[in-house]
């Protein structure tokens, strides 16, 4: 990432973000709610267009897990997983189901699941996608302590397999060599125009 600006509408809220992320590395984004972590992740995922700066990802397959679980509530857990498997062209998801301990709820409609169970089903999309780069926005939301430990284990395994992760979280990660980024270092008043924004840095 080189000299990246992130926008809400026409106004930049983050500026001049630069960092390198290699295979097997994890970056943790820190900052209070509303500081721009979600906007940065969506920009990295190209959901929000890049207006200024560069994102060079060497054509890495990327999977974004946001605040929303993106589940079809009237379908069963298995039907949701099968839907994602078809999208990502992954014919075998049995190991992913087992890893997340979803076997017992495969035939349960998602609507009947607890918040924590829904989050676990959503996490399965990361494994099913086989993406090298995971962009995670508070992925441990609604998870209990045991499942947070499971999430840490899954992330550590992904890194060992030469994956890469950028995560926004308020939790302490039990993973070695986390590279922290304080997002508030790049924060600007979102009511400042781009011309005012750049002029402010030039001062």
Question: PLM features: residue spans?
Answer:
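Conserved structural motif at the start of ABC-family nucleotide-binding domains
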Residues: 13-16
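The feature captures the beta-strand-to-loop junction immediately N-terminal to the Walker
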Residues: 30-32
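Q-loop/switch helix immediately C-terminal to the Walker
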Residues: 68, 73-92
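Conserved ABC ATPase "signature" region
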Residues: 91-106
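Conserved ABC ATPase signature
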Residues: 109-118
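Hydrophobic anchor residue at the start of the ABC signature
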Residues: 123, 162
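Catalytic Walker B motif of ABC-type/P-loop ATPase nucleotide-binding domains
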Residues: 134-138
């Amino acid at each position: 990432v080189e000299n990246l600006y992130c926008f809400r509408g026409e106004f930049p809220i983050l500026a001049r973000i630069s960092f390198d992320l290699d295979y097997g590395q994890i970056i943790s984004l820190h900052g209070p709610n509303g500081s721009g972590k979600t906007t940065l992740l969506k920009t990295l995922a190209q959901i929000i267009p890049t207006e200024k700066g560069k994102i060079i990802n060497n054509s890495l397959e990327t999977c974004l897990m946001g605040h929303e679980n993106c589940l079809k509530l009237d379908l069963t857990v298995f039907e949701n997983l099968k839907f994602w498997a078809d999208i990502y062209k992954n014919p075998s998801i049995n190991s992913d189901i087992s890893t997340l301990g979803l076997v017992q709820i495969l035939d349960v409609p998602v609507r009947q699941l607890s918040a924590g169970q829904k989050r676990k089903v959503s996490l399965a999309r990361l494994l099913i996608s086989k993406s090298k780069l995971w962009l995670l926005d508070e992925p441990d939301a609604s998870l209990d302590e045991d499942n947070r430990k499971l999430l840490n284990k899954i992330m550590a395994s992904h890194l060992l397999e030469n994956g890469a992760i950028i995560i926004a979280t308020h939790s302490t990660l039990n993973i070695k060599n986390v590279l922290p980024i304080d997002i508030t270092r790049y924060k600007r008043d979102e009511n400042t125009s781009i011309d005012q924004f750049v002029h402010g840095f030039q001062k």
